[in-house]
Amino acid sequence: MNNDLHIRTNFSASADKSLDFQKVLKMCEEKKLDRISITDFDTCIFHVINKIVDTSNLYSGEIITGMECDVCEKGVTFELLAYNFDPIKTLVWSYKTYGSLNDRQTKIKNVLVKLVEEKKLKFDKNIPFNGKVDFAHKYIFENMEKFKENNEFFKKHGISNLTDFYNASTKQKDFPLYLDMGKIWPDTKTIVDFIHSVGGVVVLAQPLKSKNRENIDFLLKNVLEKGVDGIEVYHPTHTKEDIKFLLSFARKNKLIITGGSNFNGKEPTNKLGIDNIEDQSELLVLK
């Protein structure tokens, strides 16, 4: 069985804007994936649509209800994947918790603009922003990049690309443009309690995305303490040694094992489907 349980569409701000769900489903069919989950950031709107609209002409495999939830726990930002929940109740909850895509991206953008102005950094407020399609951190970073006067600021803080900027502004409290995402996103328990209440399970996404040992230990401890049901063992960023370590941790603690491509249609190397799965029968065996 060929699975991919971590796929995004353009309902997520971080995905390619042309990547509508129809296109994604056709790609999954062409890839001959047996089982997939569309896990858009902070919304499960696709799965509500999928209950109303017949998509079997686009994709003939099994679709598991899914969503990727942004989380902030004690100042640490990461993602949790939710699966197998009631999509309608969850859509209502996600809008109350995160707001619409436009709401949350505009809110983040406005806070960052205020910080930029307070630090007297160069920025063009006349460049339009559309929270429905624009990723707030990307908008701010690319806007600031246009001004050579900001080069010294970027160099001083070791920022050479968008990933550096995003990580600094969401994880480094001493960074001048740090935004406490705990004021924007819920904590682990809020997500776990709700998803469990609507019949679903919660999985830690990309446990080893951070190469910081302290962060990894914090995330794995958080899984066990907050009732998270599983971990995403198989991911393109995980090495063979990473997978071996995570499999051992999951089996020891009787956790659900999942895997996915984290496909968003942006990077040429980011392909649908996952390889090197040791035991397909272990993948997302729901409790």
Language-model regions: role of each:
Residues 274-287:
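Mid-to-C-terminal alpha-helical segments outside catalytic/metal-binding sites
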Residues 1-2, 58-64, 143, 167-175, ...:
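Short charge-dense sequence patches
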Residues 28, 38-46, 162-166, 191-196, ...:
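A broad, low-specificity signal for short, low-complexity segments enriched in glycine/proline
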